[in-house]
């Protein structure tokens, strides 16, 4: 297998990513860092660790562009894409490999957890990931349709990846775009929870806002791009519909209904609606945390999750209004860390 590491000004983190790849129980044939015209010496850091470094003639403008540039060099049957701020559990690559014993499988992804859990935003994301990957992703895998093969770490069958033209930059969520395109092409995607990766998550509100803006617009753009094709894919259409509807209703409830009712009816207790589903969230979260012996960390991080969830709702509602109502699509790719 060949690993592609797209990197733009990632000198502070790319070494950890490379070392985690070099320490894998299943060593990759080649590690290729795509230095996307960085200005901080990212390429030099990578070269010092003995990996292949390629640099496009000009900045590609997106992670999708950098990954597709790296794909040109791949000569192996499998291709791994990993962010330059992400480290892997020592057996992550080995854990993903069995998924490709089935010829219909085109992609496989693993369990994602934040590398650092310190700030309120990192803590909120920690609970968000524990909940999503312990509950939603497992359910999607049961029906054979994981909603997305995570962009921070996924493995692909190279021939099929090339058939898709690599990663497209037509949306802000190239990983979601590729996953849904694979389904519509009759291919399968697998979720392997034993393959764990640890990306660096936004530590400040400014960084989180940048990431949420990109993610929210990316989801809406993909719904608009793929909605006809989604209708032909059983289970995926339901998963997307539920996710879109849930996010829309949640945005309306958190940002309008609850505060309005609390003020108009003079009933402050109505604001408890923000955490009314706490038991449903806590069960899978604590189950996932228990398996990792992180119960105390999880309990301490739960309040941050409800803060982040409300902020998520705000950015999703803004994206829906911008993309569907105002016709202001997001085209500039900005990193979120």
Model-derived features with residue positions:
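Membrane-embedded multi-pass helical conduit in multi-pass membrane proteins
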Residues: 246-326
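Acidic helix N-cap motif at the loop->helix transition within catalytic regions
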Residues: 15-16, 40-47, 91
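Long helical/loop segments within the catalytic core of UDP-sugar-dependent glycosyltransferases
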Residues: 55, 59-72, 76-77, 90-169, ...
